[in-house]
Regions:
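Substrate-binding groove of N-acetylhexosamine-processing glycoside hydrolases
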Residues: 1-397
Length: 397
């Protein structure tokens, strides 16, 4: 209101990410000049979705952006899903959308960008026709069927992969918690702090954030419940790996018979799909950590406790193998399949030392593989190193 006194057309845009408890009151108060950002999937047929879609009638505009879920990597092909995302916005009543695409120098053969370009000029463009023309242009008529099939399989895998909440649904959330380089140990808190420092240095957390020892929480929020984690693991295993494995084999075979530019395209796409598999497996294993460790702690039945412990051991072994595969791909591939800062890692991005950090992760997981699953329930009450207080006396309060 103060800004509108000098600029009558002033508008404030915000989102409700951290205000779920206050959402009812905030939505009731939205009016002219107070605009809301929402994710496209929120504008559904539920009571909440209908309420959001009714806001413009009160002068509160709705804004959104669209990007492919879990798309932290660069140049991941899922053109049919990309088209559906954009057309879904149009069907929801949007006449403008901010669409995120990967830069051509980093993803020169990105079919998603081709589809979005076509839709920008012709909303009724036939996606299959656009995809087929791009494939022929990239690898020739003979190689195009294999490339199109690999794109279709990858599209299927991306659709099938579940939401891993803040870790996977936001490009900025994934590097914040250093999932690629932190050890998924059964009892993270058992690892000496000095041995955890290499990745905690760039985690976006405070010294007493429970996420340091619990992948299921962040500050006072629950990122993922045990039931949600169980469902995510089951969905990933059911709907993702078969399609990615088939696409991998198809592209590997295509490379053997290709030459020149076509061969370069097939190699580029294969590297990106293998990176996607590593990325998805890390997210899947994040959910498996939550399901296994929390399940073990909560279990009362001995048989259930044993099952959850076995789940934790399987998760550790799976992530060790996956981490080794990612390090090998990073060191051998010339394809820029993920954001990397050549000047060094930061809170928002990994650096060229990624393989070195992954090897530290693997070593810690191998050392602590058989630890009993545990989460320190009082971690958030810990003192900073330089507090100058007796921890035992402090905990009495």
């Amino acid at each position: 209101e103060a800004a509108a006194e000098t600029r009558p057309d002033f508008r404030l845009l915000f989102n409700l990410f951290s205000f779920s408890n206050e959402e009812e009151f905030i939505l009731d108060g939205l009016s002219e000049g107070l605009d809301l950002w929402v994710a496209p999937r929120e504008l559904d047929g539920t009571a909440r979705g209908r309420r959001l879609k009714a806001l413009p009638a009160r002068g509160s505009e709705i804004f959104t952006t669209t990007r492919l879920q879990n798309n932290y990597l660069l140049g991941i092909p899922s053109p049919w899903l990309a088209a559906e995302e954009v057309r879904g916005l149009q069907a929801a009543g949007f006449d403008k959308a901010q669409v995120t695409v990967d830069p051509a120098p980093l993803a020169p053969f990105d079919i998603n960008r081709e589809v979005l370009r076509a839709l920008n000029f012709d909303a009724a463009a036939d996606v299959d026709t656009v995809v087929a023309a791009a494939a022929v242009r990239l690898v020739g008529k003979d190689g195009s069927p294999a490339l199109i099939k690999a794109w279709r399989l990858c599209d299927t895998a991306v659709r099938g992969f579940p939401s891993i909440m803040l870790y996977g649904d936001n490009n900025w959330g994934f590097p914040w918690y250093r999932l690629l380089v932190r050890p998924f140990a059964p009892d993270i808190g058992k690892i000496p702090e000095a041995e955890r420092a290499y990745y905690e240095k760039y985690m976006t957390v405070t010294f007493n954030n429970p996420n340091l020892v619990d992948l299921g929480t962040d500050i006072l929020w629950t990122l993922m419940t045990r039931d949600q984690a169980d469902a995510a693991v089951a969905q990933a295993d059911r709907a993702t790996w078969k399609s990615l494995d088939e696409a991998d084999g198809m592209l590997a075979d295509a490379i053997e018979g290709a030459e020149g530019e076509a061969r370069a395209v097939f190699i580029d796409q294969l590297d990106r799909l293998r990176a996607l598999r590593c990325y998805f497996r890390t997210l899947r294993n994040t959910a498996a950590w939550v399901a296994g460790v929390h399940g073990y702690i909560e279990a009362q039945d001995p048989a259930e406790k044993e099952r959850r412990e076995a789940m934790v051991r399987e998760m550790v072994d799976a992530e060790i193998a996956n981490a080794k595969a990612l390090a090998a791909l990073f060191e051998s591939s010339k394809t820029p399949f993920m954001p990397v800062d050549p000047k060094g890692e930061t809170f928002n991005i990994y650096g060229t030392n990624l393989p070195e950090l992954i090897r530290k992760k693997v070593a810690l997981m191998e050392t602590h593989r058989n630890d009993e699953p545990r989460i320190d329930p009082d971690f958030m009450w810990r003192l900073p190193p330089d507090a100058g207080l007796d921890p035992k006396a402090y905990m009495k309060y």
